[in-house]
Amino acid sequence: LANGARGFRYDTAKHIGLPSDPIDSAVVKAGGSNDFWDIATGRKAIRDISLLLPADSLFIYGEVLQDRNIPEKEYAEYMDLTASNYGHVLRNVLNSHNYYADSLDNWHHSVSPERLVTWVESHDTYCNDNESAGMTDDQIRQGWVFLAARQNGTPLFFSRPMGSSRENFWGNNRLGDRGNDEFKHPEVIAVNKFRRAMSGKPETIYANTDGSVIEVTRGASGAALINISEHEQEISMPTTMPDGNYTDGVHNATFNVTDGIIRGRLSGMSSYILMN
């Protein structure tokens, strides 16, 4: 913190005990307790040393992968939590090319969405049994646009290995190399800027009839249109955007809004960011 760090990720956080967990009798006799998280987040000092800055001024989240009997709400008293189940649901939708294939309108977590860390895939889903490694970069990117355009959740972008492909998941596989170029794809840059511009604006999510196109609107201020199919789609669907013509800055495509209906064409596996 003295050198400028303003946040922490606690790996495998769910394997570190909470105050409600059982305590070894020897620890009890010595006056100890399950106080790791109280110390780590500055609630309790140890040998008169405590966190340099208040925890609520930092971004702290724990890798608490979801499973049965995980006390998520107790962990959330100390930190934000990973929404691993939501990532699974999103990948299911992307692989099905259909918004209605699963329930993206539900965060699948017991903690409020503003306390969640989201992802399309993580290092675990990419590396462990290659659960998500077979998905194309285009699919992952459209999933990212969806997450980043949303009002809640703090999305994380997993940077796949440089030189990787769907035939060679590991790519160059050199220690210290940065990931591939997807993190600076124009669609990723556009939605990242959109996210900052839309901070605090309420969201509404729509999908067209066959679920191939998802729209995330942020009040009357902006909208993200995402084609999760591999084919061009012509849309006519509800929106909260005011009447007018809007041009996407990445593809230079124009969409028209009249009487609460947005119309236009989207290329396969592509996204369009519109701002008022």
Question: What residue spans do the PLM features occupy?
Answer:
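Active-site-proximal helices and loops of the catalytic beta/alpha 8
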Residues: A2-N276
